[in-house]
Amino acid sequence: DLFTRIKQSHFSVPKFNDWIFIIFIISVYYIFWLLSKRKYILVTFWTIIILTLLITFPTNSHHKITMLNVGQGDSILYEGGKNQNVLIDTGGKVINDTKQPSYSISKYHILPTLNERGINELEYLILTHPHNDHIGELEYIISHIKIEHIVIYNKGYSSNTLMLLSKLSHKYNIKLMDVRQVSSFKLGDSSFLFFDSFIPNSRDKNEYSIITMITYQNKKVLLMGDASKNNESLLLKKYNLPEIDILKVGHHGSKTSSSKEFIEMIKPKISLISSGKNNMYHLPNIEVVKRLQRIRSRIYNSQQNGQVTIDLDDNLKVDSNSYGNASRSEEHTSELQSLCKISYA
């Protein structure tokens, strides 16, 4: 309806550098001076110019991968230049019988980054698997930013969760796609490949994780979701995997993932581990860290490094900060979260 369309209309202004900001302030001051002189035609002219510059202000066209700081969860942003953006997972608090989500992770950790970078639309949202720490913020995200496509692996979801996803997609005019119908897609000069490495009839939803490889020029990025060693073994059997520039380490650095054979085959130059400070699971596992260190991979862990951005157009330059470490509390338990309870091995 009209209200929904209006609610989904977003306007994000990218963060300006200091010189642009100074010019903007001077221009606003000049407009007020013109108003005081009653030069209304010039006021209109300058107002149109400033608004046009704000709307068309060129954002950084570099291709970047960002591990968003969502605590004990996963959310990865890929910026493909020219406003071609993909989000992989939304983060979300772990839910069990004794612990409930206390605040909206996306409100304080994800949306501020998108707004700062002038991102008001996502071409794709890839949901790796139906665990709350990966998709728990879906409802909040899709109600605050326009999304064209959502990619899931249907077999990993219960009928109730699929029904809810279908309902939400219809409400926000998003195309819901099964990964088996897509297999790959191109976004500008970046290509996305989904590996067929699911473990049939597994009782572990982690083994239904969508594994994605992004290729840009000669750079390779591998995003593992919470895939297990079984998925890795299947990958090694079915595919001739290249060496990887950036690896999003599987399952937050748990010992259930990142086997010796797998890590030694792909030899990631940079390894990203998304895990919460002082998490009850003691992740990342020390053996996984040592395994990565032995191949001299540069390790970035959100516990110490916060949000991490890697510029694919600038020799894999890394920028890390603790952006989004909000301590505010806000009750935020969605229907989707209650359907996606998880436990860690």
Which ranges hold each PLM region?
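Conserved beta-strand hairpin/beta-sheet module of binuclear metal-dependent hydrolase folds
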Residues: H62-P112, E121, K205-S228
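Binuclear metal-ion centers of metallo-dependent hydrolases, dominated by the metallo-beta-lactamase
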Residues: G156-L193, R203-N206, K277-S329, S334
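Single conserved hydrophobic/aromatic residue that forms the stacking wall/gate
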Residues: E330-A345
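Divalent metal-coordination and catalytic microenvironments
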Residues: N69, Y78, D89, L114, ...
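Active-site HxH/HxHxD metal-binding segment of metal-dependent hydrolases
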Residues: N132-K171, L176, P268
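Structural recognition of the beta-strand scaffold that forms the well-ordered cores
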Residues: N85-D89, E123-L127, H149-I152, D178, ...
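Active-site-proximal loop/helix segments of hydrolase catalytic cores
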Residues: S106-T113, L127-S143, D196-P284
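Transmembrane helix-bundle segments that form internal channels/tunnels in multi-pass membrane proteins
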Residues: D1-T66, I270, R291-N301, Q307-N321
